[in-house]
Amino acid sequence: MTLELTPIPCLTDNYAWLWHDTATDTVVVVDVPEAAPVLKVLTDRRWQLHHILITHHHADHIAGVEALAQATGAKVAGAAADAHRLPPLDHPVAPGDVLHLGMEAAQVIAADGHTLGHIAWYLPGAGLLFSGDSLMSWGCGRLFEGTPAQMFDTLTRLAALPPETRVCSGHEYTAANGRFALSLEPGNGRLHDRMDRVTALRLAGEPSLPVTLGEERATNPFLRADDAALRAALGLPGDAAPLAVFTAARARKDRF
């Protein structure tokens, strides 16, 4: 692999995801909650930023985009369907599009649910998924604009990617999401094992991300809608449809 990945903490619990393609010296960032922390890393490493990718319109993901673009000359890419709510786009994209960024081919995947017009960026060569606030570490984004069915479709689509894919979501929410998962299944040893690892990372000042998609499939309640143990934990009948299980889990999380 020729790609260096750096999660940059921003605001209270956000991440900007910076990557450097060492083969071509191409530098890309996904989401910019604020410009200053990203500029500091670029300056410290003497890197020139070339591209800014946006997942969705919420201010805690785009507030620093224009300042960073002006400071670096980087080109901005985001969903054409959401352009009216985004900073000016040099590259309006749609699901199914591919942007060639250095040696990487970044695929655009529809990720509606948290917001409408949300997209995810998938790098099959590097095995990286930048999911914004759709699929999150040990959770999923709250449904501000979309429906449970839309988010369920998004998660099903993302979960079909290779299990070794590393998920880079927009927030350091892993521990909080894990507490919810454990509230549903307090006897699940795999959940406790993951919480132990997350706790150790955070105590060491390290990010809990990225995480493999395989780990998410095994422990994230929102990716386990066909799991009998989760249905039982939610008090649902054994023949409950996966969408009903997901909807019940999301409603429970909203009240947690």
From Swiss-Prot:
Cofactors: Zn(2+)
Keyword Hydrolase part of the UniProt annotation: yes
Keyword Heme: no
EC number: 3.1.2.6
Gene3D superfamilies: Ribonuclease Z/Hydroxyacylglutathione hydrolase-like (3.60.15.10)
SUPFAM superfamilies, per database record: Metallo-hydrolase/oxidoreductase (SSF56281)
Cofactor: binding comment: Binds 2 Zn(2+) ions per subunit.
Binding annotation for Zn(2+) 1: H56, H58, H114, D133
Binding residue positions for Zn(2+) 2: D60, H61, D133, H171
Pathway: Secondary metabolite metabolism; methylglyoxal degradation; (R)-lactate from methylglyoxal: step 2/2
Catalysed transformations (reactions): an S-(2-hydroxyacyl)glutathione + H2O = a 2-hydroxy carboxylate + glutathione + H(+)
The entry's keywords: Hydrolase, Metal-binding, Zinc
Gene Ontology biological-process annotations: methylglyoxal catabolic process to D-lactate via S-lactoyl-glutathione
GO molecular function: hydroxyacylglutathione hydrolase activity; metal ion binding
A Pfam family annotated for this UniProt entry: HAGH_C
Protein function: Thiolesterase that catalyzes the hydrolysis of S-D-lactoyl-glutathione to form glutathione and D-lactic acid.
Family stated for the protein in its record: Belongs to the metallo-beta-lactamase superfamily. Glyoxalase II family.
Subunit: Monomer.
Protein's name in the database: Hydroxyacylglutathione hydrolase
Origin organism lineage: Bacteria, Pseudomonadati, Pseudomonadota, Alphaproteobacteria, Rhodobacterales
Name of encoding gene: gloB
